[in-house]
Amino acid sequence: MSKAQDARSTATLLLPATYTVQEVFGFPSQLPLAGFAPGHPLVPKATPGYVWDAKIAKDFVEWLTEPNPDPLWIAGPTGCGKTDALKNVFAALNTPTVIVSAKSSTEPDDILGRVQLRNGNTIFVPGNLLLAYEKGYAIIFDEIDGYNPEVLMACHRLLERAVVTLDDGTVIKPASRIYMAATANTRGDGQGSDVYTATNIFNLASLNRFEKWEMTYPPAEVEEQILENTFSGKLQTTIMKAMVKTATDIRRAYLDGNCPGPISVRDLLRWGRKLIQAWNRKDVAPLYHSFDKAFGFGVDPHVRAMLHTLIQTNFGVPAPQIEGVTP
């Protein structure tokens, strides 16, 4: 059985179910949200210890309760949690999810499907994107501003929830309800391409089909709670607060042009894991060595030295000398 056929067969497992806003997002509300019964293999895994930013959660509630929600275009800096937020929504709703990844060399056929020779016959075999469209799975266009613009144009009818006619005459009708969302570092208009160099510019006809959101890094109290949920009993609260304060300072340095990139939530979690591992080491300064593994070794030594001064300020632990950098 082909992967496409297998994806079709799993649709029989889908049974509608209803969840409350409180069950999905954690704040008091019995407003119902449409989802499915547990058990489908394409439901994403929830992130352990995930904490919702209240503003983003309320935006999701508005989107999820629309009769026919438009596709989302969620723009924001790298590692701020765009894809993670979507995956946690669909995990809580037990909604099977297909994540579509592409790059500038990707062609429409690569994601929509291809004509193939089967048993001596030429047939069109739809890709998982069309299967998701037909069955009512959630669709995430990951890092969509890296797509070839022609790919997005080929998806116009899907973004409109229109009937799609395949090359062999097969008609694919959209499910009665589909959640489609795209994540991106830019708005698709070229702004920010100096930082995110592999991104593309899309025409207004494509961009007009999306509801636009902006995400940034979570507020300090949310990041602190994320660390607390992940490292409780392993790291002191004062250490986690200082880590978040350092991340905020690094992002400010980035905005001021003093750091080539911002530190992400992923980087913070990596720093915490590496700090726990290195805690008892005597051959390195654990606080700084774990930070460098998470983020610091990815920047110029002189920039790293500047970042170390931020850590020193927030933790009160003297920074080690970096070879080749004059104090």
Can you annotate each of these PLM segments?
Residues 2-238, 245:
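AAA+ P-loop NTPase catalytic core and its hallmark functional loops
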Residues 47, 281-327:
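C-terminal engagement/docking regions of AAA+ P-loop ATPases
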Residues 110, 208, 268-276, 312-314:
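Short alpha-helical interface patches
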Residues 136, 143, 235, 279, ...:
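Short coil/turn residues that cap or connect secondary-structure elements
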Residues 219-293:
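Conserved AAA+ ATPase small/helical "lid" subdomain
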